[in-house]
Amino acid sequence: MDSHLLSFLAAKTDPQNAGLWLPLWIHSRDTAEVMRRLAIHWLSNGARAALGLEEALLSKLAYFLGAVHDIGKAIVLFQCNITQHLPEVRERLARQCVFPERFVFPRATPHAKASEAILLQLGCPKGVASIAGAHHGKPQENGQNEYIEENIESYHNNYYGKGEKDLWFSLWKQMLEQHLRDAGFASVEDLPVLTIPQELLLTGLLIMADWIASNTNFFPLLSVEDLGSASLYPKRIADGWERIHLPEPWQPLSYLPMDSGSFEDRFGFPPNEVQQAVLDVAATMEAPGLLILEAQMGVGKTEAALAAAETFAAKWGAGGLFFGLPTQATANGIFGRLTAWAQTQSEDTAHSIRLAHGMAELNEDYRELFPGRSFVETPEEGVSVHPWFQGNKQALLADFVIGTVDQLLMTALKQKHLMLRHLGVAGKVVVVDEIHACDPYMITYLDRALSWLGCYHVPVLLLSATLPAQRRAELVAAYLGAKTVDRKLFSNRGYPLLTWTSGTTVQQRVVALSAGQRQVALQTAREDALPQLLEEALAEGGCAGIIVNTVKKAQAIANLLQEKMPEYQVVLFHAQFLMPDRAEKERILLERLGKRSTPEQRDRLIVVGTQVLEQSLDIDFDFLITELCPMDLLLQRIGREHRHPGHDPYRPPRLRQARCVVLTAEDGFDEGSKAVYGEWLLWRTQMLLPSAVHLPEDIPSLVQDTYSWEEQDVIPQTEESELALQLYQLKEKSKRENAGQFLILPPKKRTVLAGPAALDDWMRDERARSESQARAAVRDGDPSIEVLVMMKCRDGSVRFLPWQEGGAAVPTDRPPSLEESRAIARQRLRLPGYFSRRWAIDAVIGELEEQNRCFLGQWQQAPMLEGELVLLLDEEFSAHLAGSRIVYDRERGLTYGKEEACERDGI
């Protein structure tokens, strides 16, 4: 064999410039050096602890994996393909080896699979080889009649052509021996046997290293005449590393557990009893674990979690924070608070921050953090959006990530590049707020994600107003990787309640509160009594909130009140508004009902809304009316009433005693409510409604009795209730089973019953191929259709709605600019579920696509608008879609109805 063959092998080319290439040996070394630097300088201590490898072994193994990951490019098939447009390189290779005239099964040997097959053939451990095979984001799969290591023999023409087996085998052996020596291993026998969790994290690190080393801005290509030289190193690596300038892991400024003094320094106020209890528990925990905080609404759970996160990070070397919330709106709402906190974490070191959800780039607060195009210079202290972490796949790799809980749930979903998500969470503190908002489908993914976080020894904080005892037990069992947890332990009805793990044991603490109980009087009423109830309650002034379970009902009630009570301002708030309109309504509500609102701002204001009012909006009503819903959510809604004690002296006399009216139907339950929550929970909640709620004392008993986990049920059962329970349980089971089809395996389970653990076959039948598909996969329900709403005028022009962007026209004969695209993308709205039902969805999408092809074909060429559906309204802000008439109103949001009904009713 000519010793020059190794120097002639190609790894990278430039599709636009046939005069550039990168030799395989250089890309291998670039990736090896980058991976070693990532392992030693970028990984946090917590992530290294999750890997469970001594630093010296980790350094050697990281280098080796980076060096060998593309050994599968050293096959005749790959070299034949890549040199088709590199005549000089091809000519050099042709003097060393023979290219077959054709390949019968070229798709049978992708180069990642070839890498794994070659490493197995040369005696590498299966786990190590499977990492190389998975470096494109998905582990290799064994065929029905062929194992991966047999791929060489089965498709030998792809590997070494005809008659040159010895040549290529000798080359592979030479490459492997060189990489072993450079890494510091004497032979393949020195390579470790790894576990599945270790392999996942190392694969994530390898993917990251490969992407960085493949970026020509960091590691440029060479002229085709240049074979490269060892003299390029170490400068080539130092220059590339400086160009990317990854932020260093978070190192909290408080190196000791946070006390009350440092808490006050951080947040500007001393800790209350609940916050102090969290600080105490965090300080005494001897190992990373799970901490569940159940406490009343408005008690400051966010600050308690951030303080505990600092303590955990300081104790166990976590390099960042993930803070998950139920919706994009709640994530946007808390982003400013968490950014301000993150700024306090930086002294001399810059950190990266990421708002992680589908519409993050449209959040102006987030966009203000975007750095300039150049990021070579030494950054100033603070937090910014590091360019490398802007991709969807890299979302969880930033130091501080604020996003929807979906981002965490996707760590349990079979999805390409899943390993990057695991790498992102393994070195962080994880906080999930409003954990009660997860439905049974999402719970399945959450529990599996928790099992992996427990395996990685990630500190986790879960926040909720309250949890059913069974759910609390399931969360702990998932984190500990246990099948069950002592049932008696979770019958604790103390409140506020802390539950945490200490190794494999579980402890609890009830927080003693010095402040008095807050009493809320409850009464029931029919919907038709609403105007009279409000007239009486607001006779002396004040504000009221009405929370119902469906958008249609909210719109109907708002219409009724505007007609019957014209002297009051009625504000409608739900999810079917354009993003800018909803954001403006949120701003107005926070201004008029927030902590700093004045009596004048609050007076004679009635807000009608859906569940979005119960989620993280820090507003305070003087009087509350709510439609019947499950007890835990009912209490969450009650938490929006008399929330801020600072308003108490100014409330009208008849509203100084908190009072909540629960709307019930005359006969059975409202159909919309049954569709959302199920009949069994509504029935139990109605049966258990007291005449008054004492907060926070009554919260745990009401919730536990409603969910009926304990053996002694407080409600006598009837034949009707038993049937409702069976239907509820069947629905829950069905949701969990549907979710379970696409779950990754638990940490300790292998894909094969015997042999060393390896990633092979680990992600068969992955559910999602795109980010949007992944987000949909971890949420239950019918598929939803999101549209961008614009207006098509009689003169043929397409414009923003008059109150958006000044009603400006947008050209349709060219792709919109980036700024135009961003403004158009903000006009987003989710169509009501009716339009995504099985019998309607194809027709709806077909109509929208045809309309877009006719009028907006050029818009699909704009990257931000590619694949988007645009709903064009006429100058009356209406449109006809799939036999329905849609109308958009700035105050009411989107309404719809069958065309014949709309004509009859004058809509």
Protein language model regions, located:
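Conserved Walker A/P-loop ATP-binding site and its immediately adjacent core
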Residues: 319-343, 355-361, 467-471, 551
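Post-DEXD/H (motif II) to motif III coupling segment of the RecA-like Helicase ATP-binding lobe
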Residues: 420-429, 436-508
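Conserved interdomain linker/interface between the two RecA-like ATPase lobes of SF2 helicase motors
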Residues: 483-554
